[in-house]
């Protein structure tokens, strides 16, 4: 009897336990999955940091200074014999196209589209690029050094430098000719923050504490609750434009240093473009460089699908501006200088030239793009046309090239649609670190 009683009690307890266990097991599985992911992520991060330490060129505290020529050319007398272009000033004069260009590629500002324009121009005219070594950037977020350039030796001459870097003027200046045009692009700080947050937040550890569906709004409610100025990749989510341009993004926005640095940027850069007025910016670029209209034709690259765009209501917009106050001051300053340049160019001429640019772009869309618009990554038929995606989500759109294209446009169409990483490979850049990271992500389905 006693044994039967024990047996009954035992079965009774087993029933209750099975119910409890059925509730606990999913939690345990979730915790196990999270722990495995955390451990794997930590190991991979450590591996990539170790890889970076081995792959990164050594710091060179002393480097023989050999002056570069006044202008570079990759074949004899190029600068002198280059065909003259009709001046954009509209006065009938002719000018030589500018060959030496430094484009400071800022993040999330349509800079990949400008990069494609520069790649095409440089390739067409056999210009020499200063490319990164092993990656698609110059070891960002470290400050740029000449030793980061693939196959660099003191005194080497380059026409174009345009990949992502953290700008360091003194180092760049020693790499390019004295006649080099310095160009960059900015974006409204609120929409810029929204774009940066979407693209980068998964690789910024302090955001992992955020809860709810709208993590950006949650962060902006009390940024200092989460933000760590010294945290890994923290720069992506606070005054990123100022950081990219080489300055401290965490200084007090009211510090006189902010205005000093902004005026320094104005002195160093010949043109600061604005994403919100992209076509007008390209017309000013053409004017500055004395290029043909055909040189600045483009398709919009690395655009996000609409479903991933956060709605910036007035409250969130205001908080994003407040949080990125230095970038707001930077943008305001160059918004003023931009319209001064447009005024000097002439409003009627600008309107006419923008219209012509848009019409030619529309014509090429009909000629080149299957369906006439960008498509989701899953709908891209040619793997060589797949754009680089942010970690954990495929939100960047791409294109399908038409099957039948007139021979006259076939090469141009493909070049205009080729994503950055693939174009760099075609230009001979060694991207072994970038490609290794891509394979790891593909294997882990990140």
Please report, for each region that a protein language model flagged, where it lies by residue:
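Lumenal/extracellular "mature" regions of secretory-pathway glycan-modifying transferases
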Residues: 2-4, 20-271, 276, 287, ...
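N-terminal intrinsically disordered, acidic low-complexity segments at the extreme N-terminus
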Residues: 3-17
């Amino acid at each position: 009897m006693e044994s039967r009683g024990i047996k009954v009690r035992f079965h009774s307890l087993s029933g209750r336990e099975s119910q409890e266990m059925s509730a606990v097991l999913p939690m345990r599985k979730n915790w196990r999955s999270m722990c495995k992911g955390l451990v794997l992520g930590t190991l991979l991060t450590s591996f990539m940091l170790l890889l970076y330490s081995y792959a990164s060129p050594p710091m060179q505290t002393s480097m023989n200074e050999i002056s570069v020529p006044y202008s570079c050319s990759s074949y004899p007398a190029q600068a002198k014999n280059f065909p003259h272009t009709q001046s954009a000033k509209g006065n009938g004069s002719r000018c030589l196209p500018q060959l030496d260009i430094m484009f400071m590629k800022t993040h999330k500002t349509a800079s990949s589209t400008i990069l494609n324009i520069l790649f095409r121009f440089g390739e067409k005219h056999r210009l020499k690029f200063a490319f990164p070594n092993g990656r698609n950037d110059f070891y960002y977020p470290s400050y740029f050094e000449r030793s980061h350039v693939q196959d660099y030796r003191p005194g080497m001459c380059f026409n174009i430098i345009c990949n992502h870097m953290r700008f360091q003027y003194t180092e760049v200046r020693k790499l390019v000719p004295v006649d080099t045009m310095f160009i960059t692009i900015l974006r409204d700080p609120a929409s810029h923050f929204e774009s940066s947050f979407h693209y980068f937040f998964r690789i910024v550890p302090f955001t992992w504490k955020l809860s709810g569906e709208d993590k950006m709004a949650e962060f902006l409610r009390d940024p200092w609750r989460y933000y760590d100025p010294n945290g890994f990749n923290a720069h992506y989510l606070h005054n990123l434009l100022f950081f990219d341009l080489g300055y401290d993004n965490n200084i007090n926005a009211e510090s006189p240093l902010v205005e000093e640095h902004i005026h320094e940027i104005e002195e160093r850069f010949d043109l600061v473009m604005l994403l919100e007025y992209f076509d007008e910016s390209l017309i000013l670029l053409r004017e500055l460089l004395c290029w043909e209209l055909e040189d600045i034709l483009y398709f919009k690259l690395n655009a996000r699908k609409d479903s991933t765009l956060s709605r910036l209501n007035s409250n969130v917009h205001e908080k994003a501006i407040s949080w990125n106050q230095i970038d707001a001051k930077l943008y305001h300053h160059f918004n003023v200088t931009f319209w001064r340049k447009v005024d000097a160019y002439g409003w009627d001429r600008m309107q006419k030239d923008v219209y012509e640019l848009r019409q030619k772009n529309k014509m090429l869309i009909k000629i080149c793009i299957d369906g006439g618009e960008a498509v989701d990554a899953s709908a891209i038929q040619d793997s060589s046309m797949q754009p680089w995606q942010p970690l954990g989500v495929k939100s960047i759109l791409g294109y399908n090239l038409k099957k039948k294209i007139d021979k006259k446009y076939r090469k141009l169409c493909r070049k205009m649609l080729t994503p950055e990483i693939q174009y760099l490979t075609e230009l001979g850049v060694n991207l072994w670190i970038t490609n290794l990271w891509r394979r790891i992500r593909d294997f882990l389905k990140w």
